[in-house]
Amino acid sequence: MDNKIIVALDYETEYEALSFVDQVDPSLCRVKVGKEMFTTLGTNFVKQLHERKFDVFLDLKYHDIPNTVARAVRSAADLGVWMVDLHASGGLTMMEEAKKILEPYGKDAPLLIAVTVLTSMEDLDLLQIGINASPMEQVIRLAHLAQRAGLDGVVCSPQEVEVLRTHCGKDFKLVTPGIRPEGSDVGDQRRIMTPKQAIETGSDYLVIGRPITQAQDPLSVLKSINASIR
């Protein structure tokens, strides 16, 4: 079964993170390791997650010159992660070289996903960095660029999924943060949606953090979310 839930492991210590993953079942979710945890704990932490049979989304959002990003993506593949991402705004050549370096890995290559517009950003935020376009317009532009580069999909807000399905087709993976079960705190992400709404709209994978990781009974919450999207 293709797990649609990716749990964001946003903890300050290895003990807290491993205590959480030991409470849940790798058949019910995948896990995401971001910049903070990877910078603190490194590759050994990812290996410990693999030992527990979890698929890992390495969410480091690479953005650098093409050669540097390609080598970083290769290192992620050598680590055995399931998914890795980079910033589409790094350009076509950067994305093409990152995809090309994965060719020798064949079916064992991680999914290579592009970040389009961060879910915390709105029109004014884009304007302040010199982009005179709405988040939706910029997402479409960057998604087309990522698809042209041969990437597997993009990270986008749930509200952009339906439009991207039209523009990029059914096989282009759509990974959606900004997912909050009903009754959850919105936090710092402005463009949000419930798991059920996101799947019905066409999301492939849902990134969910605090509603699961800060729950008194995370396994029950995870089971409930999975039940809601079946």
UniProtKB/Swiss-Prot annotation:
What EC number(s) has UniProt assigned to this enzyme? 4.1.1.23
Read off the InterPro entries from this record. Aldolase_TIM, OMPdecase, OMPdecase_AS, OMPdecase_bac, OMPdeCOase_dom, RibuloseP-bd_barrel
A single Gene Ontology molecular function, please? orotidine-5'-phosphate decarboxylase activity
Q: Name one GO cellular component term.
A: cytosol
- Detail which positions bind substrate: 10, 32, 59-68, 119, 180, 189, 209-210
- Pathway(s) the chain acts in: Pyrimidine metabolism; UMP biosynthesis via de novo pathway; UMP from orotate: step 2/2
Pfam families, alphabetized: OMPdecase (PF00215)
Lineage of producing organism? Bacteria, Pseudomonadati, Pseudomonadota, Gammaproteobacteria, Pasteurellales
Matching entries from Gene3D superfamilies are given as: Aldolase class I
What positions does UniProt annotate as the active site of this protein? 61 (proton donor)
Its protein name is Orotidine 5'-phosphate decarboxylase
Q: Which GO terms of type biological process are on file?
A: 'de novo' pyrimidine nucleobase biosynthetic process; 'de novo' UMP biosynthetic process
Subunit note: Homodimer.
Has UniProt tagged this entry with the keyword Ribosomal protein? Answer: no
Its keywords, alphabetically, are: Decarboxylase, Lyase, Pyrimidine biosynthesis
Q: What does this protein do?
A: Catalyzes the decarboxylation of orotidine 5'-monophosphate (OMP) to uridine 5'-monophosphate (UMP).
User: Does the entry feature the keyword Cell wall biogenesis/degradation, yes or no?
Assistant: no
What positions belong to coiled-coil segments?
Answer: none
Q: Which family is this sequence assigned to?
A: Belongs to the OMP decarboxylase family. Type 1 subfamily.
Q: Which gene encodes it?
A: pyrF
